[in-house]
Amino acid sequence: MVLVCAGPGTGKSAFVLAYALKSKVPTLYFSADSDAFTQISRSVSILSGWSLERSTRAVREQSIEESIANDLDEIPIRFNYKASPSLDEIENALAAYDALYEDFPALIVVDNITNVRTESGDGDDPFSGLESLMDYLHEMARETGSCVIGLHHVTGPYNDGDKAIPLGGIKGQIGRVPEMVLTLHRESDGFGPDSLNVSTVKNRGGKSDPSGNDYAALEFIGDTMQINDFDH
């Protein structure tokens, strides 16, 4: 299981959506944080390089170019747009996917985990339910053989998203269960693309740096949702 954490507006949803679309692996995406119009518009921009303004207009007017529509159709991704899904609803969606395709998806995305309704929870600790949810998603990954990615927030000092976020910067300190935790922050010099910096702050299977100061820098053009290596 992988946890991807960042401040609001940093680009964590764009990062994971671009990964799902470009990998072209069978994906079930629980998009609790964004509606269908937003996700389709983002997807059009990611695949075409169009500006978000152009993509949203094309989606609204149902005038997406045929070549782009065909590209979208060929990507094996299904979305669930429940704004606050329960664990039962997540299980039902997975069972329906398995019944339809006779297999579980290679990738499951939960965007984001704070939108999931859990029955466990302590009135004095709003994040106790999230700890249980991590156990649940971890077990889901084991049972389905899927890569499960959960998106999550960070603590107040890192909400600006302009500096490296350590493992301790995860909201609710729920990094115990996931095998991998990535944190994202963005840097801009005011000219050209932003740098979307990805820190591996936990990795049971390889190198990590809990401080977040060791990161991979990706080129991020927010207007067109393009995320690439700088030397692409």
From Swiss-Prot:
Query: Pfam families attached here?
Result: DnaB_C
InterPro entries the UniProt entry points to: DNA_helicase_DnaB-like_C, P-loop_NTPase
Question: Per the UniProt entry, what are the Gene Ontology biological process annotations, in alphabetical order?
Answer: DNA replication
User: Taxonomically, which superkingdom?
Assistant: Viruses
SUPFAM superfamilies found in the cross-reference section: P-loop containing nucleoside triphosphate hydrolases
| Molecular functions (GO terms) | ATP binding; DNA helicase activity; single-stranded DNA 3'-5' DNA exonuclease activity
Q: Which Gene3D superfamilies match?
A: P-loop containing nucleotide triphosphate hydrolases (3.40.50.300)
Where are the disulfide bridges? none
This chain belongs to the protein called Gene 65 protein
Record organism: Mycobacterium phage D29 (Mycobacteriophage D29)
- What are the leading ranks of the lineage? Viruses, Duplodnaviria, Heunggongvirae, Uroviricota, Caudoviricetes
